């Protein structure tokens, strides 16, 4: 998106703070409905980040798939749960071994990510601007590049994901029949 520098920076900071607050809401809210809506906020902020980086196709896919389908499915699943079932579990706020192990794993992943970011040489990356665009294939749009990569470089993972989705669909139909 071609915005002036200060406006772009303000929107970037606003979306980043929305992303951080939404992520904290997902983890810290004891009510699963509030957590699901916070997850929706996180996914919308990610989609808006894609719009800011001129990846409109990925932003539309993010909105349609994750916000429009997955998050709505999570909200429906939480709404179908009995309210007394999950409210009893959250009244006792003691840490268990699983909570400690999970926080240890997440902290180690976070520090390894920070170490990787700091150790990476970012000078080899070609930064593009509006005046000096460096694009490999000028005539191919973003969605065509995604299609080319999915059918060549990422063919096997793409097919594995389709098989996993097919198995999940068959499993959902089998559970619904019972």
Swiss-Prot record:
Transmembrane as UniProt keyword: yes
InterPro entries reported for this sequence: NAD(P)H-Q_Oxidoreduct_6, NADH_UbQ/plastoQ_OxRdtase_su6, Nuo/plastoQ_OxRdtase_6_NuoJ
PANTHER family: NAD(P)H-QUINONE OXIDOREDUCTASE SUBUNIT 6, CHLOROPLASTIC
Top-level EC class: translocase
Residue ranges crossing the lipid bilayer per the database entry: 10-30, 32-52, 61-81, 94-114, 154-174
Predominant subcellular localization, coarse grouping: plastid
Role summary: NDH shuttles electrons from NAD(P)H:plastoquinone, via FMN and iron-sulfur (Fe-S) centers, to quinones in the photosynthetic chain and possibly in a chloroplast respiratory chain. The immediate electron acceptor for the enzyme in this species is believed to be plastoquinone. Couples the redox reaction to proton translocation, and thus conserves the redox energy in a proton gradient.
Quaternary structure and interacting proteins, as annotated: NDH is composed of at least 16 different subunits, 5 of which are encoded in the nucleus.
Compartments it resides in: Plastid, Chloroplast thylakoid membrane
Annotated organism of origin: Citrus sinensis
Any one GO cellular component localisation term in the record: chloroplast thylakoid membrane
Enzyme nomenclature, EC number: 7.1.1.-
Protein name as annotated: NAD(P)H-quinone oxidoreductase subunit 6, chloroplastic
């Amino acid at each position: 998106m071609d915005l002036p520098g200060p406006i772009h920076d303000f929107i970037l900071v606003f979306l980043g703070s929305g992303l951080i607050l939404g992520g904290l809401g997902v983890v810290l809210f004891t009510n699963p409905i509030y957590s699901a809506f916070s997850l929706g906020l996180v996914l919308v902020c990610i989609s808006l980040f894609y719009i800011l980086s001129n990846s409109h196709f990925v932003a539309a896919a993010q909105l349609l798939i994750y916000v429009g389908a997955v998050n709505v499915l999570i909200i429906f699943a939480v709404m179908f749960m009995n309210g007394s079932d999950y409210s009893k579990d959250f009244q006792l706020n003691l840490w268990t071994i699983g909570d400690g192990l999970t926080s240890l794993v997440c902290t180690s992943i976070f520090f390894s990510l920070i170490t990787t970011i700091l150790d990476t040489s970012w000078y080899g990356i070609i930064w593009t601007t509006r005046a000096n665009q460096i694009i490999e294939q000028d005539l191919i749009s973003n969605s065509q590049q995604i299609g080319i990569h999915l059918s060549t470089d990422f063919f096997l993972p793409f097919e594995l994901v389709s098989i996993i989705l097919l198995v999940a669909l068959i499993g959902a139909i089998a559970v619904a029949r019972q």
